[in-house]
């Protein structure tokens, strides 16, 4: 089960997400569902059905889990998804 403690080592496809900070101000506020992930990007399907490609390194994401929301710096998500799932993360988050 996905929790705030293991989100960095979990599959992101299918999660609801919102961009809360970004270098490109036009990206802030984009909401939707993660439909694809590459090494450096997340593909988000917006509510109107359009897909938007967001670079991980310039955004902060707010993922909606069951019962809570988790804010994640996109730089921590960089890497191929299958490698990130195996990687050990030594960062503690203040909740």
Swiss-Prot record:
It catalyses: Endonucleolytic cleavage of RNA, removing 5'-extranucleotides from tRNA precursor. Keywords: Cytoplasm, Endonuclease, Hydrolase, Nuclease, tRNA processing. This is Ribonuclease P protein component 1. It is found in: Cytoplasm. PANTHER family: RIBONUCLEASE P PROTEIN SUBUNIT P29 (PTHR13348:SF0), RIBONUCLEASE P SUBUNIT P29 (PTHR13348). Belongs to the eukaryotic/archaeal RNase P protein component 1 family. GO terms for cellular component: cytoplasm; ribonuclease MRP complex; ribonuclease P complex. Part of ribonuclease P, a protein complex that generates mature tRNA molecules by cleaving their 5'-ends. Its EC number is 3.1.26.5. GO terms for biological process: tRNA 5'-leader removal. Gene3D superfamilies: Ribonuclease P/MRP, subunit p29. The gene is rnp1. InterPro entries: RNase_P/MRP_Rpp29-subunit, RNase_P/MRP_Rpp29_sf, RNP1, Rof/RNase_P-like, Rpp29/RNP1. One of its GO terms (molecular function) is ribonuclease P RNA binding. Consists of a catalytic RNA component and at least 4 protein subunits. Forms a subcomplex with Rnp4 which stimulates the catalytic RNA. Its main location: cytoplasm.
